[in-house]
């Protein structure tokens, strides 16, 4: 089947949604579809210095190759001009399915009677969000609506329900590339590899990073609400543990490095951005992986996404086979349970400190959680997401 994927954001980018689009493109290819990906390109900006497949595959951890079309998009057009061009491009290619997270493209594609799958991760925003969403639902080509959490599905059904939502609505959380987590080393071995074979820890960081220490890790963006301040607070009370914080935009990383330096903490390490291809072996260096999301969580756009979260790190953590300490947010209980993670109050630092002490003192406890997490991860591959979408389409 010919599948045109219309991405909502620029490429390459540090945003999580570009990782998701690239992983989904790869998964559609793995399911024996002919895939082409459209991404916006601002005409007023110089192209990225390296958009070669080799560079993109390294940044996003890809194995399957697929063509990418950069389509002009003006900042004044607010993605409407891009949506028009991208849907036209898909039509000329005679795509059998259009899959997108861009509401403008979904509304136009269904109006033109293209079979369309729309995936959304948040409630339709602003004045135009609900209008575009309803336009998609009413279009002749609307075939499947994908949402990432039951909470989001419930709110959509309440506000846009029958008779508007008449197409299949399926709940599919985000996913993970399971193959990349096969045969990862045990934590101490991974830490040795981290010290000896990577540039992400260097200079003073490398000198103070102690391989034998119990290590807690966080990977992903460090926007407000992700809990990095809580991690730093916890680290003050656990000087005998390593705290590894991986990812983030340069400005955010420098801000937190400054806080760590002023606090004179030598057990907190911020690596900054690393390519997705490197992520499994760095996560493997941790004995426990942290998701200290707060009650209000910012996305790259600045909006609050705490009600509908389905972060990719959750599924990566499961696949890594490590203990997970997570904030006890209702949306996380759609995936996690007391068998797969330790769920903690997001604003109770002493509870996090005591839990990490307990895990460090009783390795058999974290091994139990890790084994259960690894088993659970098998349900959340990118390929499974694609299969569910195509099944709903049939």
Task: Label each residue range with its predicted role.
Residues 358, 365-379:
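A short, well-ordered alpha-helix in the C-terminal region of glycosyltransferases
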Residues 4-6, 146, 193, 197-205, ...:
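Conserved donor-binding/catalytic core segment of Leloir-type glycosyltransferases
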Residues 151, 175:
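Carbohydrate-associated surface elements
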Residues 7-15, 26-81, 152-153, 157, ...:
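N-terminal strand-loop element at the rim of the active site
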Residues 41-43, 219, 242-257, 272:
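Glycosyltransferase donor-sugar binding loop
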Residues 289-291, 316-319, 323-326:
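Short hydrophobic beta-strand element within catalytic cores of glycosyltransferases
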Residues 206, 213, 254-283, 288, ...:
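Nucleotide-activated donor-binding/catalytic signature segment of Leloir-type glycosyltransferases, i.e.
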Residues 311, 338, 342-349, 358-363:
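Conserved acidic donor-binding segment of nucleotide-sugar-dependent glycosyltransferases
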């Amino acid at each position: 089947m010919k599948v045109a994927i219309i991405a909502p954001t620029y490429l390459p980018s540090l945003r999580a949604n570009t990782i998701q689009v690239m992983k989904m493109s790869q998964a559609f290819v793995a399911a024996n579809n002919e895939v082409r990906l459209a991404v916006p390109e601002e005409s007023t900006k110089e192209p990225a210095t390296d958009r070669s497949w080799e560079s993109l595959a390294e940044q996003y951890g890809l194995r399957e190759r697929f063509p990418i079309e950069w389509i002009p998009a003006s900042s004044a057009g607010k993605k409407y001009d891009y949506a028009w061009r991208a849907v036209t491009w898909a039509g000329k290619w005679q795509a059998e399915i259009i899959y997108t997270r861009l509401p403008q493209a979904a509304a136009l594609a269904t109006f033109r009677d293209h079979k369309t799958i729309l995936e959304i991760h948040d409630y339709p925003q602003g004045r135009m969000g609900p209008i575009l969403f309803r336009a998609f639902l009413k279009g002749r080509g609307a075939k499947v609506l994908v949402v990432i959490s039951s909470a989001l599905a419930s709110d959509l059904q309440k506000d846009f329900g029958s008779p508007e939502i008449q197409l299949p609505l399926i709940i599919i959380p985000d996913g993970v590339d399971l193959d990349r987590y096969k045969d990862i080393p045990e934590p101490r071995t991974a830490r040795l590899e981290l010290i000896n074979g990577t540039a992400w820890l260097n200079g003073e960081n490398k000198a103070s990073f102690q391989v034998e220490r119990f290590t807690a890790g966080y990977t992903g963006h460090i926007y407000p609400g992700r809990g990095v301040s809580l991690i730093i607070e916890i680290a003050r009370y656990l000087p005998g543990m390593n705290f590894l914080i991986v990812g983030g935009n340069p400005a955010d990383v420098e801000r937190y490095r400054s806080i760590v330096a002023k606090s004179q903490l030598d057990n907190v390490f911020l690596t900054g951005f690393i390519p997705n291809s490197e992520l499994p072996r760095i996560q493997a260096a941790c004995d426990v992986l942290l998701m200290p999301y707060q009650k209000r969580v910012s996305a790259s756009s600045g909006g609050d996404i705490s009600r509908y979260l389905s972060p990719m790190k959750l599924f990566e953590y499961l696949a890594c086979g490590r203990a997970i300490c997570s904030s006890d947010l209702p949306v996380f209980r759609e995936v996690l349970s007391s068998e797969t993670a330790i769920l903690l109050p997001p604003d109770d630092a002493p509870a996090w400190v005591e839990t990490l002490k307990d895990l460090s003192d009783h390795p058999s406890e974290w091994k139990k959680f890790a084994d259960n997490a690894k088993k659970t991860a098998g349900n959340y591959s990118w390929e499974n997401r694609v299969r569910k979408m195509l099944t709903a389409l049939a």
